[in-house]
Amino acid sequence: EEDTSIGGGLSQDAAEAAADAEEEEVDADAPTFDRSTLDGIWEEAAYNRQQMVDKITAKVDSGDWGVGSDNVLRGPAGFEVDLNDCPDDWSDTGGISSSEIKIGHTTAQSGNLAAYGNIAVGWDNYLQWINGNGGIDGKNVTLIVKDDGYVAAQTIEFIDELIEAENVFALLTLGSPNSLAVYDKINEECIPHPFIMTGHPAWGDPEIHPWTTGLQMSYSTEAILWGTWIKQNLADMLPVTVAGLVMDNDFGLAYELGFEAYAEGNPDVVSE
């Protein structure tokens, strides 16, 4: 069957099916939550998170997932990471002591995109709450934030510092050009690189970059959703021409290519 996905994102058929679906598939045994209140939303999130943790834990306890005697980490859908390929001095507890878990975060807190620095503020506040409620397994989480100003060259310098001087357990990065500049090294060092704050379709490469995962929807999938919305809501105006104002970097290019790929398969939507 032909793969109709764009850049590894959600396929067009899947996106249109989701848009047309009237009911969301739910666990019949799941409790109901009041989504009209913030407390209800948080309670539902906590429930879903615990369900996920329980399922993962069961898989690890059964031996289906986790690190085997051959030092290979296995997970769902045939996911594998050969830990024998990691640096000789690597440890899966690097950056973790008896009292602390160190996480490094590069982000923009200055320059034209300084508003994105508020994400780091959110992370810090959340981790303060975690620490105030016993931490993680009794350990406090320390977030070391570096302001790269959305400049990839500065990101490289800070990532080197966080790895070599701070010996962090995990790294968080923001920005497509910034993350692309450092994710090769981060994966070579076998350092967890989760929740990248960018939707570039390069993330989600379990073979070459298994330590890197994205935080948000792929920009390629967003392009399909935009195009689907246009076709469904402007049906009486088709064909339509869509103009895009994008940044002149990897971030903007990902958006541009994603929507152009969608438009090529949908002549009623023209990309400019």
Residue ranges of predicted features:
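Short, low-complexity disordered leader/linker segments with a strong preference
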Residues: 1-101
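Extracytoplasmic "Venus flytrap"
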Residues: 49, 89-97, 104-124, 146-152, ...
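Extracytoplasmic ligand/sensor domains, especially the bilobed periplasmic-binding protein
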Residues: 56, 64, 89, 168-272
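Signal peptide-proximal N-terminal region
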Residues: 90, 121-143, 237, 264-270
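Extracytoplasmic
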Residues: 98-100, 138, 150, 166, ...
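Residues that mark the start of a beta-strand
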Residues: 100-102, 142, 240-241
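Short beta->alpha junction loops
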Residues: 144-153, 217, 272
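Short, well-structured alpha-helical segments in soluble
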Residues: 149-169, 228-234
